[in-house]
Structures are given as structure tokens and as C-alpha cells.
Amino acid sequence: MFCRTVTMAAAAALATPSAAFAWGQTGHRVIGEIAQENISGKTLAEIELILGEEDLAEASTWADEERSNPDNFWQREAGPYHYVTVPEGQTYAEVGAPEEGDALSALARFTQIVRNPNASRQDKALALKFIVHIVGDVHQPLHAGNGDDRGGNDVKVRWFGDETNLHAVWDSRLIDSRSLFYTEYARWLIREIEPSDAIAWWTADPQVWVAESTQIRDTIYPTADQSNPNLGYAYQYEHLGTAEMRLKQGGIRLAAYLDQVFASN
């Protein structure tokens, strides 16, 4: 019933305009592209059976593109699937998922669908696209929110003079400052990944990813004595490298997770 609801909602959304993207379209697609280059041949074959010619970069933004769908699933149920909440000083293991679910509980749920031999190809495709998106989301530090400011959405800032919020800066403003198309950006970041980095980052444990995001999250807020600060070159210089590290890690972790998902198939 759940998968049928998602399928019907997706079909209804074909005529619905896209919502705002998390990590930005560029960020999600960079992560998908990096993963595509690092998955095993077996995993690639399994993905092609499900998605056909659609690659991971193209699939990565689907869950955001559907968020403007008026269907109840997208407006009520699926919203929490894009983030986790971990108050400062606590761990995800301590707080767990709320009753309405979150990114990690949804990740487990969709993983079960992809692994289910009785699930239809359509249901598996929807679940796989959610997996690709969620892994990217939880590598964005403000998608591991502290529970106080809606993941930085309530933290008003200016970005080179433009009114915005801290969440938007991390979703897109930082990485879009490179002015690169996602394929160019991904190729550049792939060249920067040392073999030792790929080995060190190769973990399919979502709680590790969340712990990293919460640790970074607590270092990226403007100083407390600033009201509506104007973030510019200094903030960009200090944090763009961290954002790009999370893109690289997100791509490697997505590959690791998908290899694990399809290992038993």
C-alpha cells in the first residue's frame, strides 16, 4: 500500500512544478556522479535493471522535485525523510527517530523495498531514488539539525549582500559559487579523492555520516554577536572546502551503501 501511494503520487506530480532543492541540484548530482564512478560492476548492473538508462546523478534530485506535489504523502509523510534531528551534545543513537520518521528510518524502509524480491520494478525504482537522495541529504551538515532553528532555515544571513538563510547557503550558495556544471564539478572532485581517502571514507553506516554532520554543523554558524550577518569571501574561504569534502564523502558513501544493498542479490 505504501509503495502504491508513492507511485500514484509520483504520477500525479508530472504536471507539478519542482520545489526547492536540498544540497541544491548541483550538489545532489555531484554526489550521484561520484557514486556512479565508484560502485561495483555488480551494483551497476542491478541499478540498470531497476532504473534503466537513468543514472544516479539524474535519480538523485527526484525526491526534491516531488516535494511540491499536493498529494498527502509528499506534503505530510515524506517531509521528515530529508533530515534528522540531533540536539547539540547528543548522538543519533541516543535520540533515535521520532514517531513521524526521519531520514535514517526512511533509508532503512526504502532499503527493505529494494531488497525485496517480490517488489515491483516501479516500487524498487522509487525506493532506490529515495536512497540516493537521502544519503546525499545527511551529508549536508544542516540536514542533521539541532532542533532549534529548522536546520538553519531560521538563521537569517546575507550572502554577498543578498538576503537568505544559513540553510540555503549550505544547500547551494557555497557550491554554486564555483559556477561549474555538475559533471565538471564531479570530475574535478573525483580527481581530488586520494585512494587513501576513498578507503577511509568507505563506510555504509548512516550513523557515522550523521555524527560527522552534527560535528561540522556546530562549527558553521555565524558568531552569536552578529545579527543578520553578511557572509562573503571570508566565510566562503573558511567553509567551501568542508562543503566539497562532504560532497566527496557523500559520493563515496553512496557507492559503499549501494554495494552493500545489492551484495546479497
Task: Write out the residue ranges for each language-model feature.
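N-terminal signal peptide c-region/cleavage motif recognized by signal peptidases
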Residues: 15-19
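N-terminal, motif-rich segments that launch catalysis or mediate targeting to/interaction with membranes
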Residues: 21-134, 141-265
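Bacterial N-terminal signal peptides that target proteins for export
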Residues: 1-7
